[in-house]
Curated annotation (Swiss-Prot):
<feature type="propeptide" description="Removed in mature form">
    <location>
        <begin position="186"/>
        <end position="188"/>
    </location>
</feature>
<keyword id="KW-0449">Lipoprotein</keyword>
<feature type="binding site">
    <location>
        <begin position="10"/>
        <end position="18"/>
    </location>
    <ligand>
        <name>GTP</name>
    </ligand>
</feature>
<feature type="binding site">
    <location>
        <begin position="59"/>
        <end position="60"/>
    </location>
    <ligand>
        <name>GTP</name>
    </ligand>
</feature>
<dbReference type="GO" id="GO:0005737">
    <property type="term" value="C:cytoplasm"/>
</dbReference>
<keyword id="KW-0342">GTP-binding</keyword>
<protein>
    <recommendedName>
        <fullName>GTPase KRas</fullName>
        <ecNumber>3.6.5.2</ecNumber>
    </recommendedName>
</protein>
<dbReference type="InterPro" id="IPR005225">
    <property type="entry name" value="Small_GTP-bd"/>
</dbReference>
<dbReference type="InterPro" id="IPR001806">
    <property type="entry name" value="Small_GTPase"/>
</dbReference>
<keyword id="KW-0547">Nucleotide-binding</keyword>
<keyword id="KW-0488">Methylation</keyword>
<dbReference type="GO" id="GO:0007165">
    <property type="term" value="P:signal transduction"/>
</dbReference>
<keyword id="KW-0472">Membrane</keyword>
<feature type="region of interest" description="Disordered">
    <location>
        <begin position="167"/>
        <end position="188"/>
    </location>
</feature>
<comment type="similarity">
    <text>Belongs to the small GTPase superfamily. Ras family.</text>
</comment>
<comment type="function">
    <text>Ras proteins bind GDP/GTP and possess intrinsic GTPase activity. Plays an important role in the regulation of cell proliferation. May play a role in promoting oncogenic events by inducing transcriptional silencing of tumor suppressor genes (TSGs).</text>
</comment>
<keyword id="KW-1003">Cell membrane</keyword>
Amino acid sequence: MTEYKLVVVGAGGVGKSALTIQLIQNHFVDEYDPTIEDSYRKQVVIDGETCLLDILDTAGQEEYSAMRDQYMRTGEGFLCVFAINNTKSFEDIHHYREQIKRVKDSEDVPMVLVGNKCDLPSRSVDTKQAQDLARSYGIPFIETSAKTRQGVDDAFYTLVREIRKHKEKMSKEGKKKKKKSKTKCVLM
């Protein structure tokens, strides 16, 4: 069974833990208890393949930023979460993305942009703004509500699909390199 290491990143209070717990335990956590770092595992079937999701729920608080490099190194894919009622959390996405690319030493890291709290009546981040940002990054965008469960499975499952596409692309590139290295050199 394939295991996928997913990491949930974003500013404090955007609902990273609420999304993760909604996926794993099917319930909404109402009270805010800042996370230092929690790990969850769940077996799911995505597109007919049984797989194990190993989800790292991270601290959004700045005082824990030193821990980020470590979990970014081990993660295969990242849910970059902001709250639709918090413009600053949306602006912070750029910093998380840059840090992930730096730590992974790659421009091409599987990510999904997630706009959480879409059940709230007032929003300060427009859907189009988020779609445009995701398009500029070349990643999917999904709106979620940890409270109503809207889009929760979709966000995590889309990330797994992004990781699969990335692995497929990497293995194709690896095969191309191997083919090239088998050509014979003739000296005259």
